[in-house]
């Protein structure tokens, strides 16, 4: 009986201590202060297990399609590059203050750890308290698979190759916009899927 009472008392003390700590405001939520190692490891493991569990059953389509890669490149430029950077291009200034730091999507290590189904799930659903939004709110599944198709190719690109893709895409955009203006439409779009350089 004394053992049981001691156990209950211990639980009450632990709960009371946690409650007091939470409401004290002592814990520093600043993004400039990293998590304790044990906290980081627990959160990282919970994240990885959650992604693995919830991405089960997602079957990736064939991603070796130049049109998918081209569409994915434009989405990547619009929505991913600022936080994640690109080959030879650093992330934007504001992204460097994010915690945890957004991963380098061109890293071979990331592609060894994450299959395309997991990457699709992350892009679609986002990750709580990381700065990673859910693009499933604003993008179709096809749009997201297009992004995955480009990310799948990203690790093989050298900085000069990425710059060449950006340059060619900008030239196509300008040509298309000029054609639209001459035709009297007065508006253009940059999502013209002619295929990326070297993607065939």
PLM regions: where:
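Short, flexible loop/turn segments with low-complexity composition
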Residues: 159-170
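Periplasmic c-type cytochrome electron-transfer domains
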Residues: 2-70, 94, 114-116, 135-150, ...
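Sparse recognition of residues in long alpha-helices and their boundaries
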Residues: 88, 135, 163-164
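Extracytoplasmic electron-transfer domains, predominantly the class I c-type cytochrome c fold
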Residues: 97-153
């Amino acid at each position: 009986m004394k053992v049981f009472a001691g156990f209950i008392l211990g639980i009450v003390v632990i709960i009371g201590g946690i409650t007091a700590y939470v409401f004290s405001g002592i814990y520093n939520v600043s993004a400039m202060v990293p998590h304790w190692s044990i906290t980081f490891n627990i959160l990282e493991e919970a994240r990885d297990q959650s992604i693995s569990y919830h991405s089960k059953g997602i079957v990736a389509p064939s991603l070796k399609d130049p049109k998918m890669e081209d569409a994915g490149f434009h989405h990547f430029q619009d929505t991913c590059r600022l936080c994640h950077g690109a080959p030879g291009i650093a992330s934007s200034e504001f992204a460097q203050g994010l915690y945890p730091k957004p991963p380098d999507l061109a890293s071979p290590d990331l592609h060894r750890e994450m299959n395309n189904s997991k990457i699709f799930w992350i892009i679609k659903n986002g990750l709580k308290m990381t700065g990673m939004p859910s693009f499933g709110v604003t993008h179709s599944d096809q749009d997201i698979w297009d992004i995955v198709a480009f990310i799948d190719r990203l690790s093989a690109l050298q900085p000069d190759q990425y710059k060449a893709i950006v340059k060619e895409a900008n030239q196509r955009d300008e040509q298309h916009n000029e054609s639209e203006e001459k035709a009297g439409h007065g508006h253009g779009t940059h999502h013209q899927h002619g295929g990326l350089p070297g993607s065939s």
